[in-house]
């Protein structure tokens, strides 16, 4: 793989970039073969390993020779008949071709994105999901409006080919890629893993994720430098400018229809600190702005025209929602949380030279809440309970051992507790814990053909202490009490779907 990266780096240093000859290298298909059977990088465990006995590098070598004899075109191999590969599975070798396309595209893309990120040192944190929650907790309370963008989950193949053509000028490779994309249009879907389950092939999932991430990267690579050039510097935190808050409030209450203050309104408006923040996770993007409603509508108009003219993406304005954070009970759904901004009143004693008085200081606070109703609905789909939240037994796991059942419930609860422990209210988490506890007990009772009381008497205190250990929760709770109440501990290490639920 390192040798392939060096070869591609040498090719990309010269213009134009020729990638088509790499499809005829046998090492490329060896890489695709290793990825195909690599359990650590797969989406789900391999259940059928019968391909191991049917794979042969000799057949791949003969297929490459056949491609070279047919005017160097890989398309006949892609569209070949099942009878042309006698004794071998045509779909499996087609998966290797898709793996070859993915490996060729990933290498120059990684080199290109690395150069882009190295030139923007202060934006390196946007690649990490761990930086999203602290950024939202620190910046969103100081914003007035949010732009929620739903990126279309279907992209036309020609749009991707046009974007690839900006940095790949190898016509045969682009024609081959166009043939693959037009033949399988379901490859170009969103990065939502629920929709990716519709794609049965592992290499198709990998290529689909790459195409989606590449397209999102192209959109972001144009927006980030544009905003940096527009604001010239990153916005400062408003916590250090508490004394300027009354000044901003006076600006908002200036009568703009008065001729006396009209010029003053225009001159003072540009003294305000600009604030704009961009976050994306999968197909959802959020732009936090501080300004007026007219400014937010202008941003939506310019973003729509930019994507339509530059990326040929006909993004309608109704796909960009405007949320006003100043309204009460106005929340938005992002990263599995119901997020909102609430007003917090603090009693402050102000001392002067001769006197002191007590006043109220109203501040904005970031308020993340775990969506209990949505979680209960997801549990109902996975057969852990009904739609009303009543636990039921997990019949698919009754064939497992008792330790396996307890370990699976323990893993599910640990992931949920780690991810949603940044929530301001823990009542919903305790309700989910109650559902999982009774579902675990009912699953064991169904396996042993007994009742929940018999299961409790049989396992005793080991039933729930083993599946839901309290030591881990007590450590987290004690550690959170030591820290300030304003700070939260985010455990955002869960970025992949748990496929134990579907087993």
UniProtKB/Swiss-Prot annotation:
<keyword id="KW-0150">Chloroplast</keyword>
<dbReference type="Pfam" id="PF01824">
    <property type="entry name" value="MatK_N"/>
</dbReference>
<dbReference type="InterPro" id="IPR024937">
    <property type="entry name" value="Domain_X"/>
</dbReference>
<keyword id="KW-0934">Plastid</keyword>
<dbReference type="GO" id="GO:0008033">
    <property type="term" value="P:tRNA processing"/>
</dbReference>
<dbReference type="GO" id="GO:0008380">
    <property type="term" value="P:RNA splicing"/>
</dbReference>
<protein>
    <recommendedName>
        <fullName>Maturase K</fullName>
    </recommendedName>
</protein>
<dbReference type="GO" id="GO:0006397">
    <property type="term" value="P:mRNA processing"/>
</dbReference>
<dbReference type="InterPro" id="IPR002866">
    <property type="entry name" value="Maturase_MatK"/>
</dbReference>
<dbReference type="GO" id="GO:0009507">
    <property type="term" value="C:chloroplast"/>
</dbReference>
<dbReference type="InterPro" id="IPR024942">
    <property type="entry name" value="Maturase_MatK_N"/>
</dbReference>
<keyword id="KW-0819">tRNA processing</keyword>
<comment type="similarity">
    <text>Belongs to the intron maturase 2 family. MatK subfamily.</text>
</comment>
<dbReference type="Pfam" id="PF01348">
    <property type="entry name" value="Intron_maturas2"/>
</dbReference>
<comment type="function">
    <text>Usually encoded in the trnK tRNA gene intron. Probably assists in splicing its own and other chloroplast group II introns.</text>
</comment>
<dbReference type="GO" id="GO:0003723">
    <property type="term" value="F:RNA binding"/>
</dbReference>
<keyword id="KW-0507">mRNA processing</keyword>
<keyword id="KW-0694">RNA-binding</keyword>
């Amino acid at each position: 793989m390192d040798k392939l990266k060096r070869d591609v780096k040498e090719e990309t240093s010269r213009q134009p970039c020729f990638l088509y000859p790499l499809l005829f290298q046998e090492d490329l298909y060896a890489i695709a073969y290793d990825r195909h059977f690599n359990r650590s990088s797969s989406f789900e465990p391999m259940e059928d390993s019968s391909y191991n006995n049917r794979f042969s590098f000799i057949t791949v070598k003969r297929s490459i020779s056949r491609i070279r004899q047919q005017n160097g075109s890989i398309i006949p191999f892609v569209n070949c008949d099942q009878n042309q590969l006698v004794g071998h599975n045509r779909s499996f070798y087609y998966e290797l071709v898709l793996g070859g396309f993915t490996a060729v595209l990933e290498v120059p893309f990684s080199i290109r994105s690395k150069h882009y990120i190295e030139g923007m040192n202060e934006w390196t944190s946007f690649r990490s999901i761990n930086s999203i929650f602290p950024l939202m907790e620190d910046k969103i309370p100081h914003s007035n409006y949010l732009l929620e963008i739903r990126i279309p989950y279907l992209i036309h193949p020609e749009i991707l080919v046009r974007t690839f053509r900006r940095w790949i000028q190898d016509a045969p490779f682009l024609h081959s890629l166009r043939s693959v994309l037009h033949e399988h249009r379901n490859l170009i879907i969103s990065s939502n893993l629920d929709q990716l389950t519709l794609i049965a092939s592992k290499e198709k999932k990998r290529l689909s994720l790459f195409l989606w991430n590449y397209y999102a990267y192209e959109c972001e690579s144009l927006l980030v430098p544009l905003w940096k050039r527009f604001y010239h510097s990153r916005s400062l935190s408003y916590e250090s400018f508490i004394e300027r808050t009354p000044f901003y409030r006076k600006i908002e209450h200036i009568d703009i229809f008065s001729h006396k203050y009209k010029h003053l309104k225009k001159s003072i408006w540009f003294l305000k600190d600009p604030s704009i923040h961009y976050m994306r996770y999968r197909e959802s993007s959020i732009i936090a702005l501080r300004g007026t409603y007219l400014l937010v509508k202008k941003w939506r108009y310019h973003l729509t025209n930019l994507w339509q003219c530059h990326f040929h993406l006909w993004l309608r304005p109704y796909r960009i929602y405007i949320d006003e954070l100043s309204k009460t009970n106005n929340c938005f759904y992002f990263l599995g949380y119901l997020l909102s901004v609430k007003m917090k009143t603090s009693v402050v004693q102000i001392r002067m030279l001769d006197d002191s008085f007590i006043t109220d200081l109203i501040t904005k606070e970031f308020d993340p809440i775990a969506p209990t109703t949505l979680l209960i609905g997801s549990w109902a789909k996975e057969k852990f309970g009904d739609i009303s939240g009543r636990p039921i037994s997990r019949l698919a796991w009754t064939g497992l051992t008792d330790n396996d059942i307890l370990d699976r419930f323990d893993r599910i609860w640990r992931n949920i507790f780690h991810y949603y422990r940044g929530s301001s209210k823990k009542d919903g988490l305790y309700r989910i814990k109650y559902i999982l506890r009774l579902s675990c007990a009912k699953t064991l009772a169904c396996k042993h053909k007994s009742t929940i009381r018999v299961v409790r008497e049989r396992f005793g205190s080991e039933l729930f202490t083993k599946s839901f250990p309290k030591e881990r929760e007590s450590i987290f709770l004690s550690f959170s009490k030591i820290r300030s109440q304003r700070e939260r501990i985010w455990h955002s290490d869960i970025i992949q779907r748990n496929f134990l639920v579907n087993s």
